Curated annotation (Swiss-Prot):
GO terms for biological process: CTP salvage; UMP salvage. It is an enzyme of class 2 (transferase). One of its GO terms (molecular function) is cytidine kinase activity. This is Uridine kinase. Pathway: Pyrimidine metabolism; CTP biosynthesis via salvage pathway; CTP from cytidine: step 1/3; Pyrimidine metabolism; UMP biosynthesis via salvage pathway; UMP from uridine: step 1/1. ATP binds at residues 11-18. Keywords: ATP-binding, Cytoplasm, Kinase, Nucleotide-binding, Transferase. The keyword RNA-binding does not apply. The gene is udk.
Amino acid sequence: MKRPVLIGITGGTGSGKSTVAKEIYNKFDEACIAMIEQDSYYKDQSSIPFEERCKKNYDHPDAFDNELLIDHLKNLVDLNVIEKPIYDFEAHNRKEETIKVEPRDIIIVEGILVLQDPKLRELLDIKIYVDTDADVRIIRRLLRDINERGRTVDSVINQYLTVVRPMHMQFIEPSKRYADIIIPEGGHNRVAVDMMVANIKHLLQK
């Protein structure tokens, strides 16, 4: 097996980056592609009381255990199996269980700050930024956090105004300059997704 192709997909919360990642993932046989979500690598917070965990800024680079993520990606590149963490968004902490991820020809790394960390960036063969209007992103975030993460409307809106938007402007938006490809309109941009798939297939044939 050759060195895996690592693809980084980033963008603001609710931008459609997960949709783009899934669209690309679904274009390949499951035996040759793996998905690594940066959200799985939020730091372990077992030593912090739940009330304090609820107040933490989860859109700041310091919230992520990028050291572990980078180590896991290097292991996959070296064709080693990893144990990917599982994060519980209601408890704001890692679960004890992990998910075994085996090396694949294609590794997708998806998350809001994938292009922010220089050490993480340099591992990526293709860097994608998904660009979507802020109004669309906040609506998607609202629906996701209420339906999938057990949040209230007030808490989501408050978090967006005080944390999510400022962090987007400070860290996520500036990382766009490191992207090889910028995809507007998220997962609805079928042409861009098809072009990416063709490019990945070309890299695999080298």
